[in-house]
């Protein structure tokens, strides 16, 4: 079989590339889902955002909380505040009256304290990029109002999964922009009033039902945005859809080429091995044994190609999905685990079965007739 080594190697390479890209791309989008979903849930990512420039009072919040179907709600504000003594640096200064809604995940330092008068919980990525640590002083300025505080903790937040200044900034730049949470007490003391332009809500209700009930509760028609209209969630979902598309198109081309190459190669192999097959039959070898012998080549090509492809797929997924990889510059999340969709294993098994079947059918065709027929 040394005569066919080049063809076998080429088939193994094509199968490995096809399965590698297939597994890698599907692992990428599946891992995004697997890591962002619990992160969003743990930090209370808001399903709905009720917005009004006039702001919402504690009574308004109570009306929303009393709606049947609302799991949690909190008043919320997020504004771009400058970091004093740092040129061009700013953070998304964020306040939530309910840490279970649009909250944070503590990576280092103290737990979030809603009554703190000087505590600042700062993005850990921004802190790393700018040499801030727990216990350091920091001053945030917004429209002439300064808030002097002490960094109590380093955090991540689902609301800031993709931390950019605005829609004009495509990629996060933690050297100049991050986010920070302060307590409602510190915020209200600094601005001198109780002003929250948003009520963020966690609820599994449909938008239509929630909008109707929220409008009835507040007594007016409010601007309500879903999580699909928020940057972090929609962009993460977009990456998932892109990965699904890429994982369906490119690998298919490689796998089709590999299968066609297998059909051609096995046909040529059995044609050239016609005399040897006839000799084996003349020596008393049964058809089943000859079938097993030649079919095993196709089977081993499928096994080796798929195994190499699986390893390649993990490498592709890891290269994209790790804190220092492509997605690491885009997403800010605590977990970077790799997940394999279960259907990948079934498809790999199906590929091996198809390749083995091709080998089996090619050889069986040559076994028809007597040994004398094969030796002619």
Regions found by a protein language model. Name each.
Residues 240, 244, 331-343:
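Membrane-interface segments at the starts/ends of alpha-helical transmembrane spans
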Residues 2-3, 37-41, 275-282, 372-373:
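Short amphipathic alpha-helical coupling elements at transmembrane boundaries
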Residues 12-16, 252-255, 295, 299, ...:
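Residue-level signature of the transmembrane alpha-helical core
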Residues 263-268, 275, 299-331, 341-368:
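Small-residue-rich transmembrane alpha-helices
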Residues 1-259, 287, 327:
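Membrane transport/envelope proteins' first extracytoplasmic loop
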Residues 32, 43, 265-278:
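Transmembrane helix boundary and interhelical loop/hinge segments in multi-pass membrane proteins
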Residues 367-376:
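Short cytosolic juxtamembrane segments of multi-pass membrane proteins
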């Amino acid at each position: 079989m040394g005569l066919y080594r080049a063809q076998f190697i080429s088939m193994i390479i094509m199968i490995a590339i096809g399965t590698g890209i297939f597994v890698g791309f599907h692992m990428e989008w599946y891992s995004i889902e697997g890591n962002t979903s619990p992160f969003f849930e743990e930090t209370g990512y808001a399903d709905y955002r009720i917005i009004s420039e006039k702001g919402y009072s504690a009574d308004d919040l109570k009306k929303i909380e009393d709606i049947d179907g609302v799991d949690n709600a909190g008043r919320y504000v997020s504004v771009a505040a400058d970091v004093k003594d740092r040129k061009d640096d700013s953070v998304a200064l964020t306040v939530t009256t309910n840490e279970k809604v649009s909250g944070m995940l503590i990576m280092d330092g103290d737990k979030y304290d809603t009554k703190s008068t000087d505590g600042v919980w700062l993005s850990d990525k921004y802190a790393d990029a700018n040499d801030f640590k727990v216990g350091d002083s920091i001053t945030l300025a917004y429209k002439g109002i300064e808030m002097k505080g002490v960094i109590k903790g380093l955090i991540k937040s689902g609301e800031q999964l993709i931390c950019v200044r605005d829609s004009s900034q495509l990629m996060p730049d933690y050297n100049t922009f991050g986010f920070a949470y302060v307590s409602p007490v510190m915020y209200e003391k600094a601005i001198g009033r109780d002003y929250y332009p948003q009520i963020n809500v966690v609820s599994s209700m449909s938008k239509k039902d929630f909008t109707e009930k929220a409008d009835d509760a507040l007594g007016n028609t409010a601007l309500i945005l879903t999580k699909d209209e928020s940057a972090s969630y929609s962009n993460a979902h977009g990456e998932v859809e892109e990965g699904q598309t890429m994982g369906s198109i490119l690998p298919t081309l490689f796998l089709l080429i590999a299968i066609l190459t297998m059909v051609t190669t096995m046909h040529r192999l059995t044609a050239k091995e016609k005399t040897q097959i006839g000799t084996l039959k003349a020596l008393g070898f049964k058809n089943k044994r000859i079938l097993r012998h030649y079919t095993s080549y196709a089977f081993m090509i499928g096994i080796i190609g798929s195994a190499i492809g699986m390893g390649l797929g993990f490498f592709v997924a890891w290269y994209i999905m790790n804190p220092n990889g492509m997605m690491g510059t885009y997403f800010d999340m605590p977990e970077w685990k790799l997940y394999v969709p279960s259907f990948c294993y079934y498809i790999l098994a199906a590929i091996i079965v198809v390749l083995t079947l091709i080998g089996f059918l090619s050889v069986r065709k040559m076994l028809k007739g007597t040994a004398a027929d094969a030796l002619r």
